[in-house]
């Protein structure tokens, strides 16, 4: 990976946040969905634009054997979040100065979007069920939907409101579809 990056004039930084540049200094991927998200982020909390342009991370996918196994692993991993953040803290520098945090990336995620980030108490409970997650997700406002070949902003409505048709914008099957047509790929 290091060799491949150096061929492009790049280098691998094992950091969770860019140590010198701000979101204003960094490009945004040229996709309509990212432009919508980026402009909306500054309205919902203080660090969403940092998350989109100046952070990096690694995702891990865990398998599960049953619904009960999924629910158990979900709760355990959510309970481990503060410890994992501490163990993998690697973002103490912000804009070239000490940030006062060992994991400024953690701070960014705490201030990205209160509707989508953080840990609801039900996610930590022994009684957690997948229904708790579904109920939580239904009360989140989508940033955008894919509608009739276009990426659209649904306004201030939650998934639940859209599904119950409590708005003039209905949730329908094409919101859930992604096509690989070249024209659609440009917009999406």
Where are these regions (language model features)?
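Loop-rich catalytic cores of soluble enzymes, especially ATP-dependent carboxylate-amine ligases
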Residues: 6-13, 17-177
């Amino acid at each position: 990976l290091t060799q491949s990056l150096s061929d492009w004039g790049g280098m691998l930084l094992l950091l969770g946040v860019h140590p010198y540049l701000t979101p204003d200094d960094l490009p945004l991927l040229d996709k309509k969905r990212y432009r919508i998200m980026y402009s909306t982020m500054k309205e919902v909390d203080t660090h969403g634009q940092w998350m989109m342009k100046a952070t990096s991370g690694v995702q891990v996918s865990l398998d599960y054997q049953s619904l009960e196994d999924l629910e158990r692993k979900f709760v355990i991993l959510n309970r481990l979040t503060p410890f994992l953040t501490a163990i993998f803290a690697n973002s103490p520098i912000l804009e070239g100065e000490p940030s006062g945090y060992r994991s400024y990336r953690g701070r960014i995620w705490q201030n990205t979007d209160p509707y989508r980030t953080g840990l609801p108490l039900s996610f930590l409970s022994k009684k957690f069920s997948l229904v708790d997650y579904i109920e939580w997700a239904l009360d989140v406002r989508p940033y955008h939907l894919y509608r009739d070949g276009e990426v659209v902003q649904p306004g201030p409505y939650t998934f639940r409101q859209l599904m119950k048709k409590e708005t003039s914008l209905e949730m329908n099957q094409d919101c859930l579809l992604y096509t690989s047509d070249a024209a659609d790929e440009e917009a999406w």
